[in-house]
């Protein structure tokens, strides 16, 4: 079975990026991958997926990756990710050196002035198969900063469960002591 690693240093911060990554993880798992998270708390992932109503069947942890976020050793990250067929990495603007067969970086924010054009960054990008972003605006900034052609994948939207329509007359307005500001007194007469 193919193995995928989801790397997001922010699973303890509930936000749009976490939902995006967990939804992506669900899609990756449904494609037949054995799913691993670079995290140290399986219960936290379970709580998030339950809260966000995201279905993950069999989540595993790879705790060896988490300390590498801040270690600053590109070679250590490369070696640790080599055993995976796919790595999906939520970036903070930096580009890690990833070793999987297929490497995808998600940029949630339009990072600029972070040295995306530097030689070392461009060298690490040679190992990245695709950069994905969540909007055309983010794409325009990321493409210019990192000299790349990112792919826009919009965040998933949970369908609204509709109820039976209720017949209702709704009036929206405000109460003000001075009714003649907009000549409303004429409407009353």
Q: Residue ranges of each PLM-predicted region?
A:
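Membrane-proximal helix-turn-helix segments that form the acceptor-binding/catalytic region
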Residues: 78, 111-133, 137-141, 145
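Carbohydrate-associated surface elements
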Residues: 137, 156, 165
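Short amphipathic alpha-helix
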Residues: 17-28, 187
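Active-site donor-binding segments of glycosyltransferases and PAPS-dependent sulfotransferases
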Residues: 34-94
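Active-site proximal beta-strand in glycosyltransferases
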Residues: 86-115, 132
């Amino acid at each position: 079975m193919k193995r995928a690693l989801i790397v997001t240093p922010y699973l303890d911060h509930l936000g749009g990026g976490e939902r995006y990554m967990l939804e992506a993880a669900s899609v990756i798992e449904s494609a037949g991958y054995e799913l691993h998270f670079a995290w140290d708390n399986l219960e936290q992932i379970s709580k998030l997926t339950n809260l966000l109503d995201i279905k993950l069947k069999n989540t595993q942890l790879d705790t060896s990756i988490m300390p590498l976020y801040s270690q600053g050793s590109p070679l250590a990250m490369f070696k640790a990710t080599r055993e995976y067929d796919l790595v999906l990495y939520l970036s903070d603007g930096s580009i890690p050196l990833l070793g999987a067969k297929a490497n995808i970086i998600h940029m949630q924010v339009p990072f600029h002035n972070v040295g995306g054009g530097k030689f070392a960054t461009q060298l690490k990008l040679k190992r990245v198969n695709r950069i994905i972003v969540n909007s055309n605006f983010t794409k325009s900034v990321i493409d210019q900063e990192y000299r790349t052609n990112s792919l826009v994948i919009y965040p998933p939207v949970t369908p609204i469960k509709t109820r039976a329509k209720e017949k209702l007359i709704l009036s929206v307005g405000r109460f003000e002591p001075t009714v003649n500001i907009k000549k409303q007194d004429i409407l009353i007469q």
